[in-house]
Amino acid sequence: MRNALFLIFISLCSVCKSSAQGYSNPVIPGFHPDPSVCKAGDDYYLVNSSFQYFPGVPLFHSKDLVHWEQIGNCLTRPSQLDLTNANSGSGIFAPTIRYNDGVFYMITTNVSGKGNFLVHTTDPRSEWSEPVWLEQGGIDPSLYFEDGKCFMVSNPDGYINLCEIDPMTGKQLSSSKRIWNGTGGRYAEGPHIYKKDGWYYLLISEGGTELGHKVTIARSRYIDGPYQGNPANPILTHANESGQSSPIQGTGHADLVEGTDGSWWMVCLAYRIMPGTHHTLGRETYLAPVRWDKDAWPVVNSNGTISLKMDVPTLPQQEMKGRPERIDFKEGKLSPEWIHLQNPEAKNYIFTKDGKLRLIATPVTLSDWKSPTFVALRQEHFDMEASAPVVLQKAGVNDEAGISVFMEFHSHYDLFVRQDKDRKRSVGLRYKLGEITHYAKEVSLPTDGEVELVVKSDINYYYFGYKVNGIYHDLGKMNTRYLSTETAGGFTGVVLGLYITSASKDSKAYADFEYFKYKGKPGENK
């Protein structure tokens, strides 16, 4: 009896501890902006915008809102997602995910295509439907379901507009009505509607997705208004005295969700700055607790700011499967974290019988604003090391393969192996910055054998080198800020990609990669 009571006591202590742990932000590091979250039973699902990358709209699953695992992407077929001519400022903008009567809906905007659309599924781990195109314009659309009706909100004319739609056909069932334009900040966007205790709450973002970003909220007794703003707006921002010295900036574009225990939470985007105000990792996904004050308004993390270390009670925490440091290609398919520029040619990505990823060369380069043979992972840490062995085969003059530190078609650092007219191999480092293309260094390699390319980084520099027979050779370094959003533009973040390109359309070149390694600094995102 005494032992049984002791075990019960230990178990209760364990539960209390797990439900009172703090956590670290960002909860999803790297280029994962514009988060939207929904609850289905005791599971949570989250999506992010993806811009020019395919597949589109990464999809995550969690049990506790802190630990997330990417389980897929919502847009996995060319028929769902046309990214022709898309760049880091176009393609897929902010999505919203909602769950209603056993069906998951994801609504978003392809600003390079036909505009607003939604897809749906009964199993988020499976395929999603073909696009259902919508009539109301604007960006950052969201859905709200009530009493068998489906409402859509977006910002077609700079105001937040509401209409009723049929989510299965896309037909608009009511005229668009302006319901709020925020508190006067520029770019009223990212609207979401919730209902709590008889109030309809309209959450939006204002100020643009830079230093002046903020989250504001209004409410009404009726879904179509009139909406009254919270006297304490903004409810989240770092564009004030409380947040101006934080290493986290650009807080905004948020979504709310009620936990299984009745607690409330907000997911939002923000970015970690380097010295100054530059950021390279992109806008990331952050989590903050929410309480409701005596006047029934939400209060975010007590003072409307967030931090890297959050010492607050949480839901009982459950670890999720993380990305391995060494990624092999023996399964014959890419995990959902891998992305391509625009719509890839499937024939240029082959899995060999001996477990390698084979990339087939085309004349399309990383600077061509098209879809080169390129497959990448998001950089998630300031301090990291990435490497991959590359074997270049049947290469012609100036055919090359390697690793690119890629921000945009006009902004990338490339570490490559190539062959000259005498069939001699070399390894080189090239910088592409706007109109400037600079070959920093190129050195000869042994005639045969594997070359492992290595990219390291800290908050200030990328460091480039290679290994032959296990011996490391340095090639140079380059400042990180030239690949920052503030310098290169766009809405994405740095990705690290394997690529191959040819100097001739008749090239037969290909490159085999046995694995890709990525290791972040221990504790940076913990």
UniProtKB/Swiss-Prot annotation:
UniProt keyword Signal, yes or no: yes
Active-site residue numbers: 34 (proton acceptor), 189 (proton donor)
GO BP annotations listed: symbiotic process benefiting host; xyloglucan catabolic process
Molecular function per GO: alpha-L-arabinofuranosidase activity
Site (Important for catalytic activity, responsible for pKa modulation of the active site Glu and correct orientation of both the proton donor and substrate): 140
Keyword Hydrolase: yes
Alphabetical list of InterPro entries matching this protein: ConA-like_dom_sf, GH43_C2, Glyco_hydro_43, Glyco_hydro_beta-prop_sf, Glycosyl_Hydrlase_43
Signal sequence annotation: 1-20
Major subcellular site: periplasm
Effect of pH on activity: Optimum pH is 6.0-7.0.
Family: Belongs to the glycosyl hydrolase 43 family.
Extra information: Gut bacteria supply the human body with energy from dietary polysaccharides through glycosidases that are absent in the human genome. Xyloglucans are a ubiquitous family of highly branched plant cell wall polysaccharides present in the vegetables we consume. Enzymes involved in xyloglucan degradation mediate the conversion of otherwise indigestible plant polysaccharides to short-chain fatty acids.
Name recorded for this polypeptide: Non-reducing end alpha-L-arabinofuranosidase BoGH43A
Species: Bacteroides ovatus (strain ATCC 8483 / DSM 1896 / JCM 5824 / BCRC 10623 / CCUG 4943 / NCTC 11153)
